[in-house]
C-alpha cells in the first residue's frame, strides 16, 4: 500500500504536468538549451508517473466493484470475480512498486560524465597487471554503451601493468551505471612468474567521480599551489626537456593532482584542473552525504573506497560481488565488459533500500 507521504506527492501530479507542458512552450525556456533539456526530462518523468497513478486509481476502483460480485448467487460469476480480483490485486502491487521507484529521490549526478581512477593496490606487479585488466574491462563496457573514453593520465609499468590511470568517460547516464564500481577489487590467480602454482591475491582500487563543470565547483586562484617539472617515463627517466608536467595542490583540502601525459604544460594544466574539479566535487558531496546519512546509510557500497566490493577468482572462473552476494561463473565475459547483469542487480538493491527507508518514514 502507498503511504500518506507518497499519496500526497501524487495528488498534485496533474497540476505539475500542466505547468511543465506550459514551460515547454515558454520562449524563455526554448532559447535556453540546457533549461529546455531539463524541463523536457522532468516532463517525461512526470507524464509517466501521471499515467501510472491514473491506472492505479482505476485498479482500486475495479477492485471495489469486483468485491461486490463475490456474494453473487451465481457460482460461475463468483469464481470469475475471484479470479479477476486475484489479477487486480497482483496488478495493484506491481503499480505500487513502479510508482514508488518513480518517486525515489533522483541522484543529481546520474546523467553526468565520469572521471574513472584506477590504482594498483597490494600485490606488486601482479596488482598493476590487474589494474590494467580492470581499465580494459571498463573501456569495453563503455564501447558496448556507445560512450567515449579519454585517458587523462596514465602511469604504466615496464611489464605492461598500470600503476595508476585516470580517464574521462563521456556518455548519457555514465555515472548512474558506473557509480557502484568504487571500492577495492580483488583478484585471485596463479601469476605467470609463480613456478610452484600457488594462488596469489592482489588488489586494485577504483574510484568513480561525477565530472564537475566549472559552475559546480568554485576554485579561487589563491587556493591553488601550481608546480611545474619535467615529465618522466615508466622507469623514472626524464622524457621531456621542458617543464611540461604539472602538479596542482588545493591548499584548503590538501588534494593533489599531477598530470604529465601531454607535451604542453597548458594541456597538462587543463587536464589536472578537470581532475581536481571532479575530486573536489566528490569531496564536498561526501561531506554532505555523511551529514545527511549520519543515522542511516541508503547506498549500496557507493561510498567507502576501502570497502572490498568484488573478487575475481581465475581458478574457479568466478566473480563475486560481496555487497549483494552475487556470484557469476562468467569471469572472462565480465572482464570483457559484460557488466550489465551485475550493475542491474546493484541498482535494484539500492532501490530496495531506498524504498524501505521511504516506507519507514
Curated annotation (Swiss-Prot):
SUPFAM superfamilies: Release factor. The keyword Protein biosynthesis applies. GO terms for cellular component: cytoplasm. One of its GO terms (molecular function) is translation release factor activity, codon specific. The modification N5-methylglutamine is found at residue 237. Methylated by PrmC. Methylation increases the termination efficiency of RF1. This is Peptide chain release factor 1. The gene is prfA.
Amino acid at each position: 500500500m502507498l503511504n500518506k507521504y507518497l499519496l500526497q506527492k501524487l495528488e498534485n501530479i496533474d497540476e505539475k504536468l500542466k505547468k511543465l507542458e506550459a514551460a515547454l512552450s515558454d520562449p524563455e525556456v526554448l532559447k535556453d538549451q540546457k533549461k529546455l533539456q531539463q524541463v523536457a526530462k522532468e516532463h517525461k518523468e512526470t507524464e509517466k508517473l501521471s499515467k501510472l497513478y491514473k491506472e492505479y486509481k482505476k485498479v482500486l476502483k475495479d477492485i471495489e466493484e469486483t468485491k461486490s460480485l463475490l456474494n453473487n448467487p451465481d457460482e460461475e460469476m463468483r469464481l470469475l470475480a475471484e479470479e479477476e480480483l486475484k489479477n487486480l490485486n497482483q496488478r495493484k502491487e506491481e503499480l505500487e512498486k513502479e510508482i514508488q521507484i518513480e518517486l525515489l529521490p533522483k541522484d543529481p549526478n546520474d546523467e553526468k560524465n565520469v572521471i574513472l581512477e584506477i590504482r594498483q593496490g597490494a600485490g606488486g606487479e601482479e596488482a598493476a597487471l590487474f589494474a590494467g585488466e580492470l581499465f580494459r574491462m571498463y573501456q569495453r563496457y563503455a564501447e558496448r554503451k556507445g560512450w567515449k573514453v579519454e585517458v587523462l593520465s596514465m602511469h604504466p609499468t615496464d611489464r605492461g601493468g598500470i600503476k595508476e590511470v585516470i580517464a574521462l568517460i563521456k556518455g548519457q547516464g555514465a555515472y548512474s551505471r558506473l557509480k557502484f564500481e568504487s571500492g577495492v577489487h580483488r583478484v585471485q590467480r596463479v601469476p605467470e612468474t609463480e613456478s610452484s602454482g600457488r594462488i596469489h591475491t592482489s588488489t586494485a582500487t577504483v574510484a568513480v567521480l561525477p565530472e564537475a563543470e566549472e559552475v559546480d565547483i568554485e576554485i579561487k586562484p589563491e587556493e591553488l599551489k601550481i608546480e611545474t617539472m619535467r615529465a618522466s617515463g615508466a622507469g623514472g627517466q626524464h622524457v621531456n626537456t621542458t617543464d611540461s608536467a604539472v602538479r596542482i595542490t588545493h591548499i584548503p583540502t590538501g588534494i593533489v593532482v599531477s598530470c604529465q601525459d601531454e607535451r604542453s604544460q597548458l594541456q597538462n594544466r587543463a587536464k589536472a584542473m578537470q581532475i581536481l574539479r571532479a575530486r573536489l566535487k566528490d569531496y564536498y558531496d561526501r561531506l554532505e552525504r555523511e551529514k545527511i546519512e549520519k543515522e542511516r546509510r541508503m547506498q549500496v557500497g557507493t561510498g567507502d573506497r576501502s570497502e572490498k566490493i568484488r573478487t575475481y577468482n581465475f581458478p574457479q572462473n568466478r566473480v563475486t560481488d560481496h555487497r549483494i552476494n552475487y556470484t557469476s561463473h562468467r569471469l572472462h565475459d565480465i572482464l570483457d565488459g559484460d557488466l550489465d547483469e551485475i550493475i542491474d542487480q546493484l541498482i535494484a538493491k539500492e532501490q530496495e533500500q531506498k524504498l524501505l527507508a521511504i516506507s519507514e518514514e
